[in-house]
């Protein structure tokens, strides 16, 4: 939820933004308020005002995969012109098509490879990274047609103090799609229309948390999530199980003893 794209001190610049669109559409969490880039090689760049630490980056509500974009790269730099830079993540199109095939790498544990995989639709992207410290960060990509991006986020991720595994519902396994079956007057099947897609409502209950973690880490997130969306990413799969999520309710925080307590939330969202 820590997102420098929405920070007041940050300034956004870009190349190739189509007429009628504005790069500052990326300065909020609203997926419907998108920026559209023209065909060609383009970039979106953030100036954080000073060097900042980040250990995640996310791109949501985009068309990078269905538009078969190539050379998708995220870099950090201390130079506004990116004369020198460090590559934080790359996505390479191995095969064009519907769906296309992508592979890549990203700077986690120094370097982690992303195996070549078929990418259906436009899943939200979330890379977990080793901590990087730069003032400027830039997304670059090449596309043969216009492409939209709705949300970008970089910052420091919040990791849970305790893991949870049994009974958890991974987002990609539980996509919820509302459809309407269309029939003729005579009852002949004409097709199925998708009305809405998203993920099933998920509840996370976190037990045996230290009071200090709740106070220092959970409560700042809670204050953010009361009003704004957040990225929920489960596991280490940059192209799946990443949600642009909103909270529905918070579980009552409870004291277990003088050292430990429990918190939780119920949320829903989208995965593409």
Which ranges hold each PLM region?
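Extracellular/virion structural assembly segments
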Residues: 1-42, 52, 58-69, 78-134, ...
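A short glycine/threonine-centered beta-strand motif
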Residues: 48-50
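Conserved aromatic beta-strand anchor motif in extracellular beta-sandwich/beta-rich domains
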Residues: 74-76
């Amino acid at each position: 939820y820590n997102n420098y794209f929405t920070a007041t001190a940050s300034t956004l610049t870009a190349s190739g933004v189509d007429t009628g669109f504005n790069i500052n559409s990326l300065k909020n969490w609203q997926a419907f308020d998108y920026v559209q880039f023209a065909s060609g090689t383009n970039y979106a760049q953030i100036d954080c005002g000073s060097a900042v630490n980040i250990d995640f980056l996310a791109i949501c509500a985009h068309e990078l995969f269905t538009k078969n974009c190539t050379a998708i790269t995220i870099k950090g730099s201390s130079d506004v012109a990116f004369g020198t830079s460090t590559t934080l993540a790359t996505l390479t199109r191995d095969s064009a098509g519907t769906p296309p095939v992508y592979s890549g790498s990203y700077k986690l544990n120094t370097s982690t490879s992303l195996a070549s995989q078929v990418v259906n639709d436009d899943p939200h992207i979330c890379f977990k990274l080793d901590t990087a410290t730069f003032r400027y960060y830039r997304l670059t990509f090449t596309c043969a047609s216009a492409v939209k991006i709705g949300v970008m986020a970089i910052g420091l991720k919040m990791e849970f103090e305790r893991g949870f595994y049994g009974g958890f519902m991974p987002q990609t396994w539980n996509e919820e799609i509302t459809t309407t079956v269309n029939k003729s007057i005579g009852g002949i099947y004409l097709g199925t229309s998708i009305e809405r897609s998203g993920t099933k409502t998920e509840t996370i209950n976190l037990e045996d948390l230290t009071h200090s973690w709740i106070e220092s880490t959970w409560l700042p997130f809670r204050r953010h999530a009361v009003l704004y969306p957040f990225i929920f990413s489960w596991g280490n799969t940059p192209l799946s199980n990443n949600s642009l999520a909103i909270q529905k309710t918070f579980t009552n925080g409870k004291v277990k003893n003088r050292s430990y307590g429990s918190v939780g939330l119920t949320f829903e969202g989208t995965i593409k």
